Each structure stands twice: as structure tokens, then as C-alpha cells.
Amino acid sequence: MRIVFYAVILFYSISVFSKDNNAERNYKSNECVVLIHGFLRSSSHLKKIGDYFLKYGYSVHYVDYLSRVNQIAEISDIYVLPVVQSNCGNHDKIHFVTHSAGGVVVRYFLGKYHLKNLGRVVMLAPPNRGSEVADFLSQFSLINYLLGPMLKELGTNKMSFVNSLGIPNFEYGVIMGNSTLDPISSMIIPDDDDGRVSVDKSKLANMKDFLLVDKTHTFLMDATEVQEASLHFIQTGEFLKSE
């Protein structure tokens, strides 16, 4: 019973209500940034980093999706594709900034849809090789029912959806935190982690750059140093690192 109790506590600690957030546009730049939120989140959680890119003249657009309802492939087709087609087709470059499972969504999307004007991708805290927290929660049928099909897709099993995607064929960098506010999740994760994803499992072999910061999973995208580093990567293909 104790393990079920911990699972329920963990579920409520990460659940948030989704809400709509209309795309914001700034046409001073002819480059587009598409922001994709993570599991159990909404586009409002990326508002600060979106505003940061707006300040530098990028056209910024948000993808909102129902992570408790849709599988990752459905999210790509139903939610990401229309945002890209409607808002970014005539831009010189289309960049992506993602948080958490949003990184898995964009990996699938860019594996299926080849954009001739694709720029660079920044993944914030992506479970690129799965999450032990997803493994733990998916043991419980009630949690599976409440959280939907994406939960198992984010598992660390070699046969899981995320581990079937292969190595990305686009230019991307990963920013990962190594601080946690969630001791329960961090007990589940065997390595250094951000409270949701292990540092090791955020990495893939062909990353263009990697940056580790002392931030938590939930608030990583709100940190000034992360916003600055993300912009620098979009512009140069490298992260701006503190001395």
C-alpha cells in the first residue's frame, strides 16, 4: 500500500490543468520559433521564454495539446502540424524550443515531416531515452487511466515509443537541470536528475551541444541563463555558457 500511496502523491504533485494560450506574433523578424510544452502542462508554462524570443524579433507560436488524451504521433499531426503550416511556412527559418516531453513530440514530428526551412531545435529537460518516473507510474492501472497513453510512451524500456524514434537528423542542443524539489521522484531516478528526468537519459549521441544548469525540471524554462543560452543556440548552434 505504501508504494501506491507514493504513486498517488507523485501523480498529484505533477498534475496541472491545461489552458489555451493564443499565439503571439512579432513580424520584425523573418524567423519563426515554435514552442511545445511537456506532459501535463500547457503553453502558458512557456510564456516567459516565448516573450524572451519575441523581444529579439522572432515570430513566436505556441502548440497546445491534450497530453492526457492523445498519443505523441497524434499530437504531432493534430496540433503541431497546423501551427507550423499556418504560421511559419513563409519564414526563412523555423526553429523549435521544447520542454520535457515536447522534445519527444518534435523528434517524431521532424522525423515524419521534412521542413525545407528548418532551423535549430533547443530541447529543455527532454526524456530522450525515457523517464524512470514514467516507468514507476505506469505500473498502476488507475494512474495509467488518469494520465493517458503518453505515459507508457515515455518509458525507458527499449521497446517504448521514445526509444523507437532513432537518432535525430536535425541540429539540436539539450539544456538539462540537476536540481530537484521532488524527493519522491528523485528516489525513483537512479542518477543525477531534475526531479522528473535523469541527466543521462536526456542525452543522445549526436547532440550539437549540451548545457547543465542548477535548475529544476518545472522551472527550467523560466531561468534567465536558460533563455539566454537557448537564444544563443538558435542563433549560432552553440549554447552561451557562464564563465
Task: Name what the model sees in each region.
Residues 65-70, 214-218:
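Histidine-bearing beta->alpha loop at or near hydrolase active sites
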Residues 33-39, 44, 53-66, 72-169:
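Serine-dependent carboxylesterase/thioesterase catalytic core
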Residues 111-243:
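Helical cap/lid subdomain of alpha/beta-hydrolase-fold lipid enzymes
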Residues 25-32:
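Proline/glycine-enriched tight loop/beta-turn segments at coil->beta junctions
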Residues 21-23:
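A short loop-to-beta-strand scaffold at the N-terminal edge of the catalytic core in hydrolase folds
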Residues 3-12:
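Sec-dependent N-terminal signal peptides
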